[in-house]
A protein has these predicted regions:
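Noncatalytic, beta-rich nucleic-acid-contacting surfaces in large DNA/RNA-processing enzymes
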Residues: 1, 7-514
Length: 514
């Protein structure tokens, strides 16, 4: 029962068998920085420090160092000797840095130096901001956070795109995402069929191929990848609880493939009974009469991929005495890592809210997706030419033996754009006078792309164009180049995409102006 789990967990913390670990998700970007600052206000500036990291020399780099050493001295080493020497170099500290999310909190009645020395990350006492001004460097713990994580409280203040997407959806629609019901049937149906999108699997397959087209989860956080869409096709979840289980399967290691998937397919267990999160292990064992503390210890071992036992414990004997089924024990022994249920629930709540917008506010959903999720991967020259162009590009990437990470990212975004076109929605051409620097805008029932989705045109130049335009409209390509700080190659790209249509090359001067 939940009550049994709570009392067992309380007992564990009282006995100090587990150090609390707190993860907090904030909107990536500015909000994460604000949250980091707020911890200083909450606990005191002298009690909060960024967790330090130590970067060691990698294996390939070490191998290169040894080869270079031999070459510089005219020595000849065979490969085995080089590998032996490089093994001694690998892992040696090269520089220090800071953990992107880790915050170490020192008790108010203690000194941080009782736990760790302090230092500037990478020994840089001063840094330069984006405007070239000198600012103080970041003070971090000298020991890396793994070395002191069991001695001090660590907060993981993580940047996450989902809250950012939900905030944008609220801003552009005026709909409060907290009022979205988690039992909405149309939204739930997306995870087992694309029917709520007004599409059939055949229509989707004709545009994006056959992977995961019998569900409508394309582009949704947690569920949008081909792997997880395949999970949805195997399980056809019917409620929120089953969505949480699938999130647990996808975040775990060796939890789904060759484990829960086989048990469900072979009829050994149902979806709701298979192990998907850490809590499942502990709850199941308590329900079978295993002692709460033993149940907790087994869960801790299983979640870390360490099986049932640790250091001479007698956990297996207790499980056998409680008649725990063999399938459950076998499943535990296969697991490499298990996700916590509360974490999965938080992710699924955000994913479900975004899915609701996909069903009921499609244009807003795609505007938020392309603005935040597709940043840097929106292939404007391909997508803005229409569905046929997208199909052709997807076929080209699918035919590659080893597509690059950029091509894979582009393909995912093109698939979502193709789905959008199939739903009867479309893009406007990029407009020199109306496009935003970085946000897709909803204009007359269509999406207006921003400047930063143009190849090689980054955020900084996109902002310069918008700032210059606010002063007064561009009068020529020469004017755009000068005031918008745009290079000739980008001018050529804009020209080829039709963005500069009707704009003269140079300033036109009238005789009557004199």
């Amino acid at each position: 029962s939940t009550q049994g789990y709570s009392s067992a967990a309380s007992d564990v913390y009282k006995r100090q068998d587990k150090v609390p670990d707190i993860d907090l998700n904030f909107s990536s970007g500015d909000d994460q920085g604000v949250a980091h600052k707020y911890t200083e206000e909450l606990f005191g500036r002298d009690n909060v420090f960024r967790a330090g990291t130590i970067a060691g020399i990698q294996d390939k780099t070490a191998y290169g160092f040894v080869k270079k050493y031999a070459e510089n001295r005219g020595l000849t080493f065979n490969d085995i000797f080089i590998e032996k020497l490089s093994a001694g170099v690998a892992g040696v500290k090269r520089t220090t840095g800071q953990h992107p999310a880790g915050i170490m909190v020192c008790p108010r009645d203690m000194d941080i130096h009782n736990f760790t020395p302090l230092q500037y990350a990478a020994n840089k006492k001063y840094l330069k901001d984006e405007n070239g001004r000198q600012i103080p460097g970041t003070i971090t713990t000298h020991f890396d956070y793994h070395s002191i994580s069991g001695r001090m409280l660590k907060l993981d203040i993580l940047g996450h795109d989902d809250p950012k997407v939900i905030r944008m959806l609220q801003d552009i629609t005026g709909i409060d995402p907290l009022k979205i019901p988690f039992d909405d049937q149309k939204t739930l149906s997306l995870f087992s069929s694309p029917e709520a999108l007004g599409l059939t699997p055949d229509e989707l397959a004709s545009a994006i191929g056959n992977k995961g087209v019998t569900v409508g989860a394309l582009g949704l956080p947690e569920y949008g990848t081909p792997f997880v869409r395949g999970m949805l096709e195997d399980t056809r979840p019917k409620n929120f609880s089953e969505l949480v289980r699938i999130s647990g399967f996808s975040h775990g290691t060796d939890v789904w493939l060759n484990n829960a998937q086989d048990l469900i397919k072979n009829g050994v267990v149902k979806l709701e009974d298979a192990i998907s999160t850490r809590d499942d292990v502990m709850n199941y064992l308590i329900q079978h009469g295993v002692k709460p503390l033993t149940s907790f210890k087994v869960m801790e071992n299983v979640r870390k991929g360490k099986g049932l036992e640790k250091g001479g414990s007698n956990n297996r004997a207790e499980l056998d005495a409680a008649h725990v089924p063999q399938w459950f024990i076998d499943s535990c022994l296969k697991i490499g890592y298990l996700f916590p249920r509360a974490h999965a629930v938080a992710y699924v709540m955000m994913a479900f809210r975004i899915a609701w917008f996909k069903v009921y506010q499609p244009l807003a959903y795609y505007a938020a997706y392309f603005t935040i999720r597709a940043e840097g991967s929106f292939n404007a020259p391909v997508i803005l030419r229409g569905l046929a162009s997208m199909k052709q590009e997807l076929a080209r990437i699918a035919a590659l033996d080893k597509p690059t990470a950029v091509e894979k990212g582009n393909a995912t975004v093109i698939e979502v754009a193709a789905e959008m076109y199939l739903r009867g929605l479309s893009f406007l051409p990029i407009d020199l006078e109306k496009s935003d620097a970085s946000q897709f805008l909803m204009v007359d029932g269509k999406l207006l792309p921003p400047f930063n989705c143009i190849p090689a045109l980054g955020d900084a130049v996109a902002k310069e164009i918008v700032l210059a335009r606010q002063d007064h409209p561009f009068t020529s390509k020469e004017d755009l180049k000068k005031r918008g700080k745009v290079s000739q190659s980008i001018i050529d790209t804009l020209d080829s995409m039709g963005v500069l249509k009707g704009l003269p090359e140079e300033e036109q001067m009238s005789l009557f102006a004199f």
